[in-house]
């Protein structure tokens, strides 16, 4: 039997001592037994695969049974910080093999120096190209332009920057689309869209294929005015109202317009641009949405729900809107009323095409007047334009305001005297002549406005010097055309005048009388002459005039018994002081009612200090005993005879006077000479305007009154001796 040997502690200690003894003598033997040394194992921590292979190799080399039974220390596996991947392994192998490969190639190139020069240069160029391509790819991704930078609006702005807005008329600027496309760095098809819109507004015109002529904005106002008229002819305004919900009555016109548009074969971008601009011009709000414009511009042959046609139309309209925005004709706004995000465009281009057509002259005027603006405030041109009087009269007559006259700077001369026996006071009020008829009375009445004018009346030779010059102050007369009513009212006036010995109730109405309303109601800016005759030669002598006496009223009542009642509106005039006005208040049936007299007014300055002369309801007399004696006002359709002198013992006492008739002196023209008629014949014509109880010297007949216009009637102030 084979004996089994057992290891004892002595054997183990012998191995340690053996190692210590041989370690100093032989280094190779130390390397063979280093795996059994614990300190060496702690210092070296191989991987699992390495430890296994080392253990296997160690056991193969060491055949000693003592080493074979030594159990190795199991180390904990540590995860690799960067786990290997196939790509990482490939990179590691390439890096490991690259030095050897480079060394091998470098050795080959050492023996071929001439061929090596060309190859090295080519390799360097290829490396540079590869690097530049990589950098360009990175820059391209970083510097990629946005959609706004590539938009048609920005491209149009660059295109417009190449040419002036207002070129010289003698200068011809040609546009080559190929050159422009190359200059802007875009395709030519992008330039086509811009040029088509510009051609629709006549900013450019086609000369040849891909050749255009630049005109600028000089023709833009005329083009827009023509498009506005064309849009109205095609009833685009009714279409816009219908889309806004206001054009239900225009359905028939809209159908006709659609039928006309459906027959139109030209569907180019230029025509569509013109239609799009027409919608802005005819719109009341001058705002258009692309949705509305697309539905209007779609022909009747296709349904609006046809998506492809509708979307195409909207896309093309959006391109047109971008170009128009670059031209500063429209702008995109946001409507708060609209809940959708669809764009809304508003017209900001020229609106007054006639005034903007002379843009060159306007710019010249602005540049010339710019230096004088600080020195002198410029007045608007409308202040220097004199409008037509009929227009002013129509506007003023509709104004519900109380009239008052303007203050005049002209001097008033009352000191002139005439040497003739029949002295005449000529009241010259102005030079304007604008006769017309004032409306606003009932049908039974005739309201005549008498412009007091001096231009149409001949000036007698004996009256070369006017005695008074007053501002434009017309008189307004209302009279009734009913003869019987006039006679009845005169009878009432007779009865009221018989009680003239009592104190007259004086009405004082102070009102601010506006000059514009006076002109509209009485046709202002006209003048009138009124002679006042005095046998003593001094028409303004207080002794030559008398007050309105009740006896004279009774004496003259028989002459004007059939005359119709009259009403006088007398404004505040400084030259009419101390004149008596009889204003009848009682009326017969069918006469002038009180409400029909808006100017039944005597202003307070005229009647200041007046004393009441009667308290009857039939008449009210106003008298101012200041400078002049009261005289009689007689107003008729033609020349006037001189009335008798009214003596007023209340104010100045009785003054004898003679009867005079200046009719021949007043009318140098034979055609206008008036023959005296009876008061009865004059009342039949109903053309007299105003009479007081004084006697009539003469009145005008009907045929002569027709010859004389309302602008030629005169106001005569006269007096004669009492019968």
Swiss-Prot record:
Compartments in which it is found: Nucleus
Cited SMART domains: E2F_TDP
Transcription regulation recorded as keyword: yes
InterPro entries xrefs: E2F (IPR015633), E2F_WHTH_DNA-bd_dom (IPR003316), WH-like_DNA-bd_sf (IPR036388), WH_DNA-bd_sf (IPR036390)
DNA-binding region range list: 147-216, 264-349
Disrupted-gene phenotype: Embryos lacking both e2f7 and e2f8 contain multiple intersegmental arteries that completely fail to migrate from the dorsal aorta. Gross morphology of these embryos and initial formation of main axial vessels are unaltered.
Biased composition (Low complexity): 520-535
SUPFAM superfamilies, alphabetized: Winged helix' DNA-binding domain
Name of the featured protein: Transcription factor E2F7
Native organism: Danio rerio
Taxon lineage: Eukaryota, Metazoa, Chordata, Craniata, Vertebrata
């Amino acid at each position: 039997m084979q004996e089994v040997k057992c290891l004892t502690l002595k054997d183990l200690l012998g191995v340690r001592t053996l190692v210590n003894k041989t370690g100093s003598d032989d280094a190779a033997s130390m390397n063979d037994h280093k795996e059994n040394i614990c300190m060496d194992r702690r210092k070296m921590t191989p991987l699992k695969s390495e430890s296994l292979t080392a253990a296997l190799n160690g056991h193969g080399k060491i055949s000693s049974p003592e080493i074979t039974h030594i159990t190795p220390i199991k180390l904990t596996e540590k995860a690799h910080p960067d786990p290997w991947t196939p790509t990482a392994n490939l990179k590691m192998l390439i890096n490991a093999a690259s030095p050897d490969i480079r060394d091998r190639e470098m050795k080959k190139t050492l023996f071929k120096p001439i061929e090596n020069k060309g190859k090295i240069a080519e390799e360097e160029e290829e490396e540079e190209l590869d690097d530049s391509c990589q950098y360009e790819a990175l820059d391209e991704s970083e510097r990629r332009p946005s959609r706004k930078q590539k938009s048609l609006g920005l491209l149009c702005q660059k295109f417009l920057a190449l040419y002036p807005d207002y070129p010289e008329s003698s200068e011809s600027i040609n546009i080559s689309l190929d050159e422009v496309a190359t200059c802007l760095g875009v395709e030519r098809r992008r330039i086509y869209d811009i040029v088509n819109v510009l051609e629709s507004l006549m900013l450019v015109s086609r000369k040849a294929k891909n050749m255009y002529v630049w005109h600028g904005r000089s023709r833009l106002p005329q083009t827009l005015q023509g498009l506005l008229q064309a849009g109205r002819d095609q009833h685009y305004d009714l279409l816009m109202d219908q889309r806004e919900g206001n054009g239900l009555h225009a359905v028939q016109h809209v159908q006709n317009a659609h039928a006309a548009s459906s027959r139109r074969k030209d569907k180019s971008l230029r025509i569509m641009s013109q239609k799009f601009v027409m919608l802005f011009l005819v719109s009341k709000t001058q705002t258009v949405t692309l949705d509305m414009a697309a539905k209007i511009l779609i022909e009747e042959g296709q349904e609006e729900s046809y998506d492809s046609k509708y979307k195409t139309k909207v896309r093309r309209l959006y391109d047109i809107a971008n170009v128009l925005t670059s031209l500063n004709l429209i702008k995109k706004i946001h409507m708060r009323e609209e809940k959708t995000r669809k764009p809304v465009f508003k017209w900001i281009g020229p609106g007054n095409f006639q005034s903007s057509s002379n843009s060159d002259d306007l710019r010249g005027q602005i540049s010339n007047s710019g230096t004088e603006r600080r020195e002198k405030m410029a007045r608007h041109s409308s202040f220097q334009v004199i409008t037509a009087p009929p227009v002013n009269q129509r506007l003023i007559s509709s104004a519900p305001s109380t009239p008052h006259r303007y203050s005049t700077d002209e001097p008033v001369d009352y000191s002139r005297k005439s040497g003739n026996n029949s002295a005449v006071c000529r009241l010259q009020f102005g030079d304007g002549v604008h006769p017309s008829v004032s409306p606003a009375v009932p049908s039974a009445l005739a309201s005549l406005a008498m412009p007091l004018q001096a231009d149409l009346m001949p000036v007698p030779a004996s009256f070369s010097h006017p005695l008074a010059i007053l501002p434009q102050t017309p008189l307004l007369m209302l009279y009734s055309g009913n003869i019987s009513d006039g006679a009845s009212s005169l009878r009432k006036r007779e009865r009221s005048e018989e009680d003239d010995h009592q104190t007259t109730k004086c009405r004082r109405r102070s009102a601010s009388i506006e000059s514009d309303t006076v002109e509209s109601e009485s046709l202002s800016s006209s003048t009138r002459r009124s002679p006042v005759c005095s046998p003593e030669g001094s028409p303004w002598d207080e002794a030559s005039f008398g007050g309105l006496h009740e006896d004279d009223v009774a004496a003259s009542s028989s002459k004007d018994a059939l005359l119709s009642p009259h009403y006088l509106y007398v404004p505040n005039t400084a030259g009419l002081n101390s004149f008596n006005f009889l204003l009848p208040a009682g009326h017969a049936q069918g006469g002038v009612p009180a409400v029909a007299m808006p100017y039944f007014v005597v202003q307070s300055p005229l009647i200041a200090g007046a004393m009441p002369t009667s308290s009857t309801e039939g008449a009210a007399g106003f008298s101012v005993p200041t400078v002049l004696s009261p005289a009689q006002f007689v107003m008729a359709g033609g020349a006037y005879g001189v009335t008798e002198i009214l003596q007023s013992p209340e104010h100045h006492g009785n003054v004898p006077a003679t009867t005079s008739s200046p009719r021949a002196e007043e009318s140098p023209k034979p055609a206008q000479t008036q023959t005296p008629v009876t008061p009865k014949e004059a009342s039949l014509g109903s053309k007299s305007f105003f009479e007081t109880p004084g006697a009539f010297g003469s009145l005008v007949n009907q045929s002569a009154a027709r010859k004389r216009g309302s602008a030629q009637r005169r106001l005569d102030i006269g007096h004669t001796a009492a019968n």
